[in-house]
Each structure stands twice: as structure tokens, then as C-alpha cells.
């Protein structure tokens, strides 16, 4: 699954959820966040870093860790505008994120995980979803 497929699937998902004002997205080799979008009714932005499916065994783990590092390095502080952050990942990488990303960190950083399957269906996970998944594993 290519990064462009993940990105376009998430853009379609967000537009159905009333995110779409001032939509900006970069090409594969552009610098900056992959998707930046404003909520249609509120002064809130989503900044999302997307990754595609890798080939090797460890590539899903690498995609998660790399995207997390990229989105953290782009986080904005201060100001009155509220920013939400997201990791846009193929399903396999998203499952790793659900296990490995501490829900407390996701809550503090307003960080969400977007999981994209082979058909382009997207599921959004909040810190509450991470907490449930991690509590269930105990």
C-alpha cells in the first residue's frame, strides 16, 4: 500500500467528518507535514504524517516510529489555535502504534492514529481507544 493511497483515503475520511477548510497536502517528496486541514466550523487544525506499507518484516515498526518522530518534530506550541496531530498508517503499522504508543502521551499531545485498510477504509483512534486496547492486553 503506497503512501499516496493512505493519504488520499484519510483526506476522504476527514472531509466526511467536517474537516476540509484550507486543506493542504504535500507530494511524496515535499517538506513538512503530509496533511494539514482545518475544521469547517472551528479554529482547529489536524496535522497528519502518513506512511505507506513497507516490504520487509520490520518495515511496519519502522513506519510507525519514523512517522511518530516526524509528527513530533512538527508540533507547534503556544498561540490560540488548537492543533491536533495524527499518524496516518496502513493497518499493520497502526496495530503496532495501538500497542506501543502510550495513551497518556497521545492524550497530552492530542495525537490520533488513523488506520487505513487495503480498501481505503479509515478508522480513527483517540487516546481513549489506545487506553482500552492497552488495558485489554494487561
Which residues does each PLM region occupy?
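Acidic-basic catalytic patches of nuclease active cores, encompassing PD-(D/E)XK
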Residues: 1-31, 38-43, 78
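Conserved catalytic cores of phosphodiester-cleaving nucleases, focusing on short active-site segments
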Residues: 35-37, 44-56, 74
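Active-site-adjacent loop/helix micro-motif of nuclease/hydrolase catalytic cores
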Residues: 55-68, 95-98
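Basic, amphipathic alpha-helical patches used to engage nucleic acids or provide basic targeting signals
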Residues: 61-77, 82
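Nucleic-acid nuclease catalytic cores
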Residues: 75-119
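N-terminal targeting/trafficking signals and adjacent low-complexity tails
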Residues: 89, 97, 127, 135-136
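Polybasic (Lys/Arg-rich)
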Residues: 112-118, 122-125, 133-137
Amino acid at each position: 500500500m503506497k503512501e499516496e493511497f493512505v493519504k488520499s483515503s484519510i483526506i476522504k475520511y476527514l472531509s466526511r467528518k467536517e474537516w476540509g477548510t484550507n486543506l493542504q497536502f504535500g507530494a511524496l517528496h515535499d517538506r513538512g507535514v503530509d496533511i494539514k486541514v482545518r475544521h469547517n466550523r472551528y479554529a482547529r487544525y489536524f496535522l497528519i504524517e502518513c506512511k505507506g506499507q513497507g516490504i520487509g518484516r520490520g518495515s511496519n515498526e519502522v513506519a510507525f516510529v519514523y512517522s511518530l518522530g516526524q509528527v513530533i518534530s512538527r508540533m507547534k506550541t503556544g498561540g490560540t489555535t488548537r492543533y491536533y496531530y495524527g499518524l496516518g498508517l496502513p493497518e499493520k503499522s497502526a496495530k503496532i502504534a495501538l500497542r506501543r504508543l502510550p495513551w497518556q502521551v497521545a492524550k497530552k499531545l492530542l495525537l490520533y492514529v488513523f488506520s487505513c485498510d487495503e480498501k481505503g477504509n479509515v478508522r480513527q483512534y483517540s487516546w481513549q481507544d489506545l487506553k482500552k486496547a492497552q488495558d485489554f492486553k494487561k
